[in-house]
């Protein structure tokens, strides 16, 4: 008797693809719901809807961003092929802004820049997760591939600018209320506004590194993709 062959659904590659497909589908549904909700609210209430964007979709946004931390594990154990450090920088940016700045300071949640930031984040994520979800099942569309590799070029810098402006607008509130600051009985007390100011400078350094990495990755990917298209 020859060696037994496992059914397709028991093979590691199949299970990995099923898991990734479900993960991407959940993220796609979450970000689609957020963007659809924001769009409907804007057309229903106009500019007034921007002030309470966080109250309407903040919970789902926090869930989606929390789940996205799994991507670091995916890369570490090898089921995703992205590089760990650039993805770590991108996720860290969002976690700090969403949880450290917006969620922890109620006055910031009402700012219009929060609405703009959420729109930019969700535009990127909807395209990225749609492309990733279809790639797992072996489906490829040239237009979607190009969009997933190109949309970030104008939007990612806008995201960083919106994040920086969010931090800038939050500073007076953190300084006034002392949110997230720790007072100790010696000279090592932690003042959160100073941490944010330091992070504000690091944000643009991280943007340069991430943008350079993504641009190099885009050139390599599209070159290989164009060769495959010619051979089809």
Swiss-Prot record:
Q: Which GO terms describe its molecular function?
A: enzyme binding; very-long-chain (3R)-3-hydroxyacyl-CoA dehydratase activity
A single GO cellular-component term on record: endoplasmic reticulum membrane
| One GO BP | very long-chain fatty acid biosynthetic process
Which terms are listed as keywords in the entry?
Endoplasmic reticulum, Fatty acid biosynthesis, Fatty acid metabolism, Lipid biosynthesis, Lipid metabolism, Lyase, Membrane, Transmembrane, Transmembrane helix
Query: Which Enzyme Commission number(s) are on file for it?
Result: 4.2.1.134
Task: Give the catalysed reaction(s), semicolon-separated.
Answer: a very-long-chain (3R)-3-hydroxyacyl-CoA = a very-long-chain (2E)-enoyl-CoA + H2O; (3R)-hydroxyhexadecanoyl-CoA = (2E)-hexadecenoyl-CoA + H2O
- Topological domain (Lumenal) residues are 41-56, 134-135, 179-189
Spans traversing the lipid bilayer: 20-40, 57-77, 113-133, 136-156, 158-178, 190-210
Q: In which pathway does it act?
A: Lipid metabolism; fatty acid biosynthesis
Provide the protein's localization: Endoplasmic reticulum membrane
* Active site per the UniProt annotation: 156, 163
InterPro entries in the record, alphabetically? Answer: Tyr_Pase-like_PTPLA
* Segments on the Cytoplasmic face: 1-19, 78-112, 157, 211-232
The function of this protein is: Catalyzes the third of the four reactions of the long-chain fatty acids elongation cycle. This endoplasmic reticulum-bound enzymatic process, allows the addition of two carbons to the chain of long- and very long-chain fatty acids/VLCFAs per cycle. This enzyme catalyzes the dehydration of the 3-hydroxyacyl-CoA intermediate into trans-2,3-enoyl-CoA, within each cycle of fatty acid elongation. Thereby, it participates in the production of VLCFAs of different chain lengths that are involved in multiple biological processes as precursors of membrane lipids and lipid mediators.
Subunit record text? May interact with enzymes of the ELO family (including ELOVL1); with those enzymes that mediate condensation, the first of the four steps of the reaction cycle responsible for fatty acids elongation, may be part of a larger fatty acids elongase complex.
The record's comment on protein family reads: Belongs to the very long-chain fatty acids dehydratase HACD family.
Designated name of the protein: Very-long-chain (3R)-3-hydroxyacyl-CoA dehydratase 4
